[in-house]
A protein has these predicted regions:
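Boundary regions of SH3-family modules and the immediately adjacent low-complexity/disordered segments
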Residues: 153-169, 216-235
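Short consensus segments that form the blades of beta-propeller domains
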Residues: 1, 48-57, 192, 204
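Short glycine/acidic-enriched loop and turn motifs that connect beta-strands
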Residues: 43-49, 98-103
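Multi-bladed beta-propeller domains
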Residues: 11-24, 70-79
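Acidic, small-residue rich beta-repeat scaffolds with periodic aromatic anchors
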Residues: 55-175
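Residue-level detector of Asp-centered blade-edge/turn motifs that repeat once per structural unit
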Residues: 32-33
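SH3/SH3-like beta-barrel superfamily modules
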Residues: 194-232
Length: 235
């Protein structure tokens, strides 16, 4: 059983799944631009049917990988696995005809802010892929903070990605008075935690009314914390 590993510059990521096998037979093709790879895979194992009977099965799957970051953009089975790249655009279709069925794989790309379920049940592999597809930014870093609290198995990898994001923020401010921490920019979401005068924080963004600042703080142990504070508590 083969595997699939993504390499780019000094970064690598194992994209394999333990319940699938990977055989390169020439059917996995890059898109016209070279940005995506349409990869064919097989699922193997025993599947339990409605009557309680377990049967061994092989099932074909296809996944599109973004070759710029290793993101598995979409993962599916069925008829769409027979689709191929057409023309000179990154379009998957049943044929090159004008009325051919097209598969909108890009709409399936994982986005953390679109996840409505509890984060605790998400597999570590899926979270690692989510980070590759939708890395921490000012739009989603607060959601990643919540994920780190709710999913203990993936806490380490999520906090690492948050730390990497914060390291790229150049705007730094200093706490001037005791600063209570809030999960959202309003008084109803106050936590028991706080920062003390002299603490250094990285400024992520300011609320529209300028009364709150979204900050990132890295404690003495190197663990990141994302929170909201009142603007007047910072220098």
């Amino acid at each position: 059983m083969g595997g699939i590993v993504f390499y780019r510059n000094n970064y690598s990521a194992d994209l394999s799944r333990s319940d699938r096998y990977y055989i390169e037979d020439g059917s996995s093709k890059p898109s016209p631009s070279g940005k995506y790879l349409n990869r064919n895979e097989c699922l193997w194992g025993y599947v339990e049917f409605g009557d309680g009977v377990k049967k061994y099965t092989d099932k074909a799957y296809c996944s599109v990988v973004d070759m710029t970051n290793g993101c598995i953009v979409s993962d599916w089975d069925g008829e769409a696995c027979g689709y191929s790249w057409v023309g000179n655009k990154d379009v998957l279709a049943s044929s090159g005809g004008v009325n051919a069925d097209k598969f909108d794989f890009q709409s399936m790309c994982p986005v953390i802010n679109k996840i409505i379920d509890d984060f605790s049940g998400i597999d570590e592999k899926d979270i690692a892929n989510l980070i590759r597809c939708d890395s921490p930014s000012k739009e989603n870093v607060n959601t990643y903070q919540r994920m780190a609290k709710e999913n203990k198995k993936a806490k380490r990898v999520v906090l690492k990605s948050i730390s990497e994001y914060l390291s790229g923020i150049t705007e730094i401010s200093t706490v001037k008075t005791k600063s209570n921490l809030f999960t959202l920019p309003n008084d109803n979401n106050k936590t028991s935690a706080y920062l003390v005068p002299g603490d250094k924080v990285r400024v992520i963004q300011t609320s529209p009314d300028n009364k709150w600042i979204n900050i990132g703080y890295i404690n003495a142990k190197g663990s990141p914390l994302i929170s909201w504070v009142r603007t007047e508590t910072l220098e």
